[in-house]
UniProtKB/Swiss-Prot annotation:
EC number: 3.2.1.15
Sites where a glycan is attached: N165, N175, N214, N399, N421
Keyword field: Glycoprotein, Glycosidase, Hydrolase, Membrane, Repeat, Transmembrane, Transmembrane helix
The UniProt record lists the keyword Cell cycle: no
Top EC class, one word: hydrolase
Transmembrane segments: 15-35
One of the record's GO cellular component terms: membrane
Lineage of producing organism: Eukaryota, Viridiplantae, Streptophyta, Embryophyta, Tracheophyta
Each PbH1 repeat, start to end: 230-256, 257-278, 319-340, 348-369
Active-site residue numbers: D271 (proton donor)
Pfam families: Glyco_hydro_28
Localisation per UniProt entry: Membrane
Bilayer topology: Single-pass membrane protein
This protein's name: Probable polygalacturonase
Length: 491
């Protein structure tokens, strides 16, 4: 059964490239779409291309960026075209939602905001180019759980694609590209010339029911994908590429978010591939919004100077119930890293990682209680973090310089650490001592080389000792719909 369009978005210039959405129950069928023109006439369109993809919602209305004056020549600024398109399509939120189609071309733009019940779809040959004009990046206040910007104490530049207080938002495509052209920002950062914190590529705040999928993200000025204070988030099939020495180009950073799923992503980064966060020092403690119920699976990461999965260091609101599996780490500094320090407060607990393959690493595991700077001098020196219930199992690592560096906090040890069925093959020039452990407590089973005495071996019969929850999280029950669009040209 096919549900076709019944309404046309008004006031669009003819001729146009129209973009239609309908929901398909079984398979895509060939159709001829009819468009009612302003005089009440109908004429048949020729289908040039049919697109089908999976999404949390399909849309009843659609338009192309060219309908709003967009020019994809790589030189014409399209910020207003994006803003006008989103404004017009926002009118259809209560009528089945709307989609904005970005066709093949190079679309130069500054920051623009999305709306609810909305899909931004990039053609496979579409490239969004971030403007190098600083005036195209509005400045907004720091995040309340951080108290200040990360690069500078004042505000922060709005992300290229931004949204706040939204519901049902999809950013997807046929592997279209978003290029942050971050070189200018990296130079300003290294030169100490930033008045405000660098923008991210995608940031959605205070939002729910989010899908970000099937895109390539290049050269972000800073973090790539940053959902914050949000819930019910699906990030799927994303490729993220940045020079390995580019500053703070984290891949995906869920921050004070609940019910998030990250899967089937490939990331090459100058910082952590996935960094789980929840606020900074006293600001994060006061805001009190944890990141919890997070699933990470089928992630491949290359990050020579940072971690594949990092927890912290801004974790003052708490991090709980993180489940990662089927992870591939290549030429990265550390596989799993927990970063915190005195003054952070908060907690990192109930962390489960299994099925990880690591090749050419500095450390397989790194935990430290002596990491990171503070937001300001008003942090509480008595705010000790709680690190407990850390479970790693079923892993193989090759060409590793050091198996683990585990450093808790004196008088505040990291507890409940469990490592089982892990084989680490050391590099030819590995450290003489493969494990260092201070102020940590836990157990191990079937681990090579033998861990520290503070992680006593429980015997080979208990190699499945460390927990991994059997029950699914709510985000795993989300079922995607088949959405299909026919791109038609009307001469």
């Amino acid at each position: 059964m096919v549900e076709t369009h019944k309404k046309k978005i008004a006031n669009l210039t003819q001729p146009i490239v129209s973009f239609y959405c309908f929901q398909v129950v079984s398979v895509l069928v060939a159709v001829v779409l009819l468009l009612s023109v302003s005089r009440g006439e109908c004429r048949k369109g020729r289908i040039l291309e049919a697109l089908e993809y999976s999404a949390i919602s399909c849309r009843a209305h659609s338009a192309s960026l060219v309908d709003f004056g967009g020019v994809g020549d790589g030189q014409t600024l399209n910020t207003k075209a994006f803003q006008d398109a989103v404004s017009e399509l926002s009118k259809y939120g209560s009528e089945g939602g709307a989609q904005l189609y970005v066709p093949a071309g190079k679309w130069l733009t500054g920051s623009f905001s999305l709306t609810s019940h909305f899909t931004l779809f990039l053609h496979r040959d579409a490239v969004l180019l971030a403007s190098q004009d600083i005036s195209q990046w509005p400045v907004i206040k720091p995040l309340p759980s951080y108290g200040r910007g990360r690069d500078a104490a004042a505000g922060r530049y709005t992300s290229l694609i931004f949204g706040t207080n939204l519901t049902d938002v999809i950013i997807t495509g046929d592997n279209g590209t978003i290029d942050g052209q971050g070189g200018l920002w990296w130079q300003r950062f290294h030169g100490g010339k930033l008045k405000y914190t660098r923008p991210y590529l995608i940031e959605l705040m205070y939002s729910a029911d989010i899908q970000i999928s099937n895109l390539t993200l290049l050269n972000s000025p800073s973090w790539n994908v940053h959902p914050v204070y949000s819930r019910n988030i699906l990030i799927q099939g994303i490729t993220i590429l940045a020079p390995v020495r580019s500053p703070n180009t984290d891949g995906i950073n869920p921050d004070s978010c609940t019910n998030t799923r990250i899967e089937d992503c490939y990331i090459v980064s100058g910082d952590d591939c996935v960094a789980v966060k929840s606020g900074w020092d006293e600001y994060g403690i006061a805001y009190g919004m944890p990141t919890k119920q997070l699933v990470i699976r089928r992630l491949t990461c290359i990050s020579p100077y940072s971690a594949v999965i990092a927890l912290g260091s801004e974790m003052s609101g708490g991090i709980q119930d993180v489940r990662a599996e089927d992870i591939v780490a290549i030429n990265s500094e550390s596989g799993i890293r927990i970063k915190t320090g005195i003054g952070r407060g908060g907690y990192v607990k109930d962390i489960y990682v299994r099925g990880m393959t690591m090749k050419t690493m500095k450390w397989a595991f790194w935990m430290t209680g002596n990491y990171g700077s503070h937001a300001d001098n008003h942090y509480d020196p008595k705010a000790f973090p709680v690190i407990q219930g850390i479970n790693y199992r079923d892993m193989v690592a090759e060409n590793v310089s050091m198996a683990a560096r585990l450093e808790g906090i004196p008088s505040d040890p990291f507890t409940g650490i469990c490592i089982s069925n892990v084989t680490i093959h050391l590099a030819a020039k590995a450290k003489k001592v493969p494990w260092t452990c201070t102020d940590v407590e836990g157990i191990s089973s079937g681990v090579t080389p033998t861990p520290c005495s503070t992680l006593p071996d429980q015997g080979p019969e208990k190699t499945s000792l460390c927990n991994f929850p059997a029950e699914s999280l709510p985000i795993d029950t989300v079922e995607l719909q088949k959405c299909s669009y026919g791109i038609n040209y009307y001469p």
